[in-house]
Amino acid sequence: KDIAFGPMNYGVSEEEAKQQARELIKLVGLPEDILTRSPFDLSGGQMRRVAIAGILAMNPNVLILDEPTAGLDPRGRQEIMNMIYRLHKEKGLTTILVTHSMEDAAMYADELIVMNKGTVAMKGSPREVFGQHTQLKEYGLDVPESLRFMLKLQEKFQLEASDTVITFSEVVEKVQHLMQQGERL
């Protein structure tokens, strides 16, 4: 009902809205039988997927999500973020994601905008923004755990500062490269 509500208010027939709801529920990775279940029987992650399907039913050009993974367990968080990223790529949706999760920002964002006291403080790719980790700390933000780990390695082993690594797979590649060059870690 929640998914069909918006389109029906804009004149879409009930049958067409229900058909669209069935398609959207699959698109967000849920089984069709969820449409007959009470919202009180759904997990937090399922409720968020249903809410996103309801938004998608309105065929938006822009999807704005504020902390869509707050309160979810790590698996649920990753599933929701992967789904949002997939929808962004497949449907060509401009997606604006408000988050305090630097890991999500590093993994999924094409561009970051850091706000400080209501103004744009920084703007750029995740690599560019996280490369300015000292300035981020001034704004009360941290860097992804992977970059924090790499910075500690550089400090402990007196390694030259190198390209900003923002994912753990990049950390692994960087450490392997350093070891192949004879660095003792």
Model-derived features with residue positions:
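Catalytic Walker B motif of ABC-type/P-loop ATPase nucleotide-binding domains
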Residues: L63-D66
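Hydrophobic anchor residue at the start of the ABC signature
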Residues: I52
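Conserved ABC ATPase "signature" C-loop
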Residues: K117-G118
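Conserved ABC ATPase signature
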Residues: S38-L42, Q46
